[in-house]
Amino acid sequence: GLSRPSKRCIAGGQPCEFHRGYMCCSEHCIIFVCA
């Protein structure tokens, strides 16, 4: 899938700190929304 690791992403549904349009899911930035 389209994901990016993120050390600051913890809670699901939070915007990613440096990937606009991505959401945080399991400490990763996921495009669109959490599955």
Curated annotation (Swiss-Prot):
One of its GO terms (molecular function) is ion channel regulator activity. Residues 1-8 form a propeptide. Disulfide bonds join 9-25, 16-29, 24-34. Its main location: secreted. The keyword Ribosomal protein does not apply. GO terms for cellular component: extracellular region. Expressed by the venom duct. Keywords: Cleavage on pair of basic residues, Disulfide bond, Ion channel impairing toxin, Knottin, Neurotoxin, Secreted, Toxin. It is found in: Secreted. It comes from the Eukaryota. Probable neurotoxin with unknown target. Possibly targets ion channels. Belongs to the conotoxin O1 superfamily. The presence of a 'disulfide through disulfide knot' structurally defines this protein as a knottin. This is Conotoxin Cal6.1g. It comes from Californiconus californicus (California cone).
